[in-house]
């Protein structure tokens, strides 16, 4: 138990220590200031901008920025889709893997361009090396950079005033890849290789075991993809077992690096925001609220897994309980990680829009599974994905400012800018589109007989498997309850739709809000006379409960039919 507390404290301290330097670095990169990596990144950026031509030089309005973002995503989608369909005739296909069916290729392409990395295939048997490296790994970089671009555009809109432009998407995209994601990923990949993660393009090995049978050992360019998988909060595993596989996550060191890299950029953006708007206290308040939400989720999930079987009334279980004192849920977990390392990793991955797992979420207790769903359902705002976590949290921040200001009889304003009805329309659109998407698609799937046939469990847990899939898709997480066999035409298409709506619907609202904020006057006098201090402890509490009430209650009825009912059923076993 003491070792668990030490690990947790070390993890939190590490995140806190890297937040300021990495946040300052991100600020310098996007504010066109000199950095230590200019010598490495600038040559790539010059070539990239030369190819783009004039489109990369002019500042863009919100509509132009969004149009460029969508145009890029459409091109990326077509690129990935074609490779997945034709991978059977493309090079570097040592296992002679055939091209995907169109519905599965469509689902996978949408999944990777939206930074979701939902996988209805097994990586080691469903995708060739060529497709892994050129299609999926590349999207791990650029889809993360797209989210980062949106966050930076939003931050600019708060910092700027009385102008019409929020930056240039193409320029921001290059900076996100060449200055931030690529250099850090190279370092992480090298560390992974030294820790035993394979990095090659050799055919799978056929070995004879001591039992006299033949076993196929998969390998491939794993380290390079694993590095950006976590740093870019992508989560899609090279193997079906994801980070539970010893080739993806061989040691406690790689496990720790993956957890830190998942939160690194999301945490740093809180400081980037504070520094850019000239109020670092505001950034640290955001960091603090995120941290409290994370700790609560981790505590509930860990206690549920450590003591989740204590209440079962089976005589055999009670006999064991009498001998050992308590029963921990080790089903679906690697013995080398144990309960706490598993729950910590999965709390991190579901809090961020990562979706990587080092244990089987479907085998978690219903209460722990519910916490994983809640982490995603509130909009992935507990640090969240690269960029997406920050702009998702900012929507709740705007709502809290609006509610708090009206409660004390003041005109809503944030950092000297008046918050008006149009701003709140975009805010509520961003906050409600994903929950609506989840509830509609889950309700439809729950009454379709063909979906029932894909479930390995019935009743409340079967419903939880469906609910989890659409929560994960709409919030761009990508993790799953493995009891759902997702490779059907209906699930491939509807989950793809939920990923598209959850990603680009929210981004559209965020960029439109940025376009509104950037045009406003910034009155320091307005900020000073307002009695709503947005850096105070009271305001932090208001933001905290706004997230729980608005984010949590929208999905609570569905949770009542799934994991809550599942937990109550277990109590009476």
Swiss-Prot record:
- The answer to whether keyword Transcription applies is no
Residue stretches spanning the membrane: 6-26, 66-86, 135-155, 177-197, 257-277, 283-303, 382-402, 428-448, 493-513, 537-557
Tell me yes or no: is Transport among this UniProt entry's keywords.
Answer: yes
MF terms in GO: P-type potassium transmembrane transporter activity; potassium ion binding
Annotated membrane topology is: Multi-pass membrane protein
Q: Which domain of life is it from?
A: Bacteria
**Which residue pairs form cystines in this protein?**
none
Q: Which NCBIfam families match?
A: kdpA
* Family recorded in the similarity comment: Belongs to the KdpA family.
Quaternary structure, per UniProt, is: The system is composed of three essential subunits: KdpA, KdpB and KdpC.
Q: What PANTHER family does the record point to? A: POTASSIUM-TRANSPORTING ATPASE A CHAIN, POTASSIUM-TRANSPORTING ATPASE POTASSIUM-BINDING SUBUNIT
Its recorded name reads Potassium-transporting ATPase potassium-binding subunit
Species in which this protein is naturally found: Francisella tularensis subsp. mediasiatica (strain FSC147)
Q: What is the lineage of its organism?
A: Bacteria, Pseudomonadati, Pseudomonadota, Gammaproteobacteria, Thiotrichales
Gene name per UniProt: kdpA
